[in-house]
Structures are given as structure tokens and as C-alpha cells.
């Protein structure tokens, strides 16, 4: 059970980044990308703790079988659970489902950061603008969207907004350390 786990030991299909890259390769060959998922997270516990994704309050996955402190620490692949974040215009069923169809979603586990990600042809001063989100939508695509190649084949600019989880009085949140962007592409080598 040695920790940390070597990521290279996982099958390549265990990483969504590889599935996304395979979709790009299929699109290059056939014009169709069957792998354009939106991402959400959720818990799969059997303890009636939906939304209970804080590590400090983790009560286990199966209740009586892993209820001891030792058993809670025994499985490196377990965590308190995931959460789905959906960027809908309003908190109504139809607006939420429309945002899910747009794939304007993300998954998180444990903490509850507020993240926005856009790509497009942006001015380099976008971050200083008071209407940055409006400009981001107007000149690009949000997370989950399909980014078309620009006429001049220029690389897109990213606009990212991330706010840390506010935490609670009992469990204050830590500052964000970094944002990691994993880039995938297809070239002549595949």
C-alpha cells in the first residue's frame, strides 16, 4: 500500500486527460469527437451524508465496515467525496440542466473553491476590467465549451478566476496555493 501512489502505475484510461486527448485525435481523423464530457463530482457513500465532502468530518464510506479510525486511513483511493459545481444563470431546474448541457461544470472534492475558466482571444488587460466575465463570455468560451481555431492560428489566452473555499469558524480554509492547467494536444506524432 505504499504511499504516495505512482501515477504512472494507473492505466492510461484512469486519467480523463487521456480520454480528452483521444477525442481530439479522433476528431482530427474523422471530424467527430465523441469524448466531450462535462465534469461533475459526487459522493458515493452509504452513510446518508450527501455533500459531506470535508476531510476533517469524513465518517467513512460504508458505515459499520470502516467506522474505526484505522480503517478510515486504510484506503488511499478513498476520500470524503466529490461535489458538482454547475454555472447556471439562476437556481432553477431548466437553467441548471441547460448549464449541464453546455458542460459549464466542474468537480471538486473536499474544499469548495469558486473557479471560472475561459479561453479565447482576450485583451491582455482583461483581469483589470470591471466587466471581465462579460468580456470573457463575449470573446471566448467558458469551461466545457468548444474552442474553435483562430483565423491566424494564434494561441488562445486563458482567463481564470479562482476564489478559495471560505471554510467555517471550526474549520477555516487554507489559501489557494496554485492553479494547475493540464494541457493536451494532438500533433503529427499522435
Task: Please annotate each region the language model reported.
Residues 1-190:
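C-terminal functional module detector
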Amino acid at each position: 500500500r505504499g504511499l504516495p501512489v505512482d501515477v504512472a502505475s494507473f492505466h492510461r484510461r484512469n486519467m480523463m486527460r487521456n480520454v480528452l486527448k483521444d477525442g481530439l485525435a479522433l476528431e482530427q481523423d474523422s471530424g467527430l469527437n465523441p469524448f466531450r464530457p462535462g465534469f461533475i463530482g459526487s459522493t458515493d457513500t452509504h452513510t446518508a451524508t450527501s455533500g459531506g465532502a470535508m476531510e476533517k468530518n469524513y465518517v467513512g464510506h460504508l458505515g459499520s465496515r470502516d467506522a474505526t479510525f484505522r480503517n478510515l486511513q486504510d484506503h488511499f483511493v478513498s476520500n470524503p467525496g466529490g461535489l458538482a459545481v454547475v454555472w447556471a444563470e439562476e437556481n432553477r431546474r431548466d437553467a441548471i440542466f441547460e448549464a449541464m448541457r453546455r458542460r459549464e461544470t466542474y468537480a471538486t472534492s473536499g474544499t469548495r473553491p469558486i473557479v471560472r475558466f475561459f479561453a479565447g482571444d482576450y485583451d491582455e488587460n482583461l483581469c483589470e476590467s470591471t466587466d471581465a466575465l462579460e468580456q470573457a463570455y463575449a470573446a471566448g468560451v467558458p469551461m466545457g465549451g468548444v474552442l474553435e481555431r483562430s483565423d491566424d492560428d494564434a494561441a488562445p489566452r486563458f482567463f481564470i478566476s479562482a476564489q478559495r473555499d471560505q471554510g467555517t469558524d471550526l474549520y477555516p480554509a487554507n489559501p489557494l496555493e496554485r492553479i494547475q492547467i493540464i494541457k493536451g494536444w494532438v500533433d503529427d506524432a499522435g
